[in-house]
Amino acid sequence: GGVLASLCDVALAGAVSSSMEKNQWCLTAQLDVEYINPAFPGEIFAFGKLVKRGSNLAFVEGGIESKDKKLIARAHGIWIIKNFTVNK
């Protein structure tokens, strides 16, 4: 379960980061994963979709599918978006 949750975390973070500016970073505030079917050896695919984005929060959903499109895990979460500045 932990490996699948980590894959969901990365996929959903990717969906968030695709909407961010270069001076922003994000971190997981909440991640919920539902395990639907077992994952067997072979190719699996993690995916994420941005559902709603505000200035400080992003809501995302996604999951993991097998090569034959069988849903293995479903995930949704909230990401915090922060601006950063570089001090010289």
Walk through the language-model features, giving the residues of each.
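HotDog/MaoC-like acyl-thioester-processing domains
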Residues: 38-47, 51-88
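Hot-dog-fold acyl-thioester-processing enzymes
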Residues: 1-13
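Hydrophobic beta-strand-centered segment that forms part of the acyl-chain substrate-binding groove
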Residues: 13-45, 50
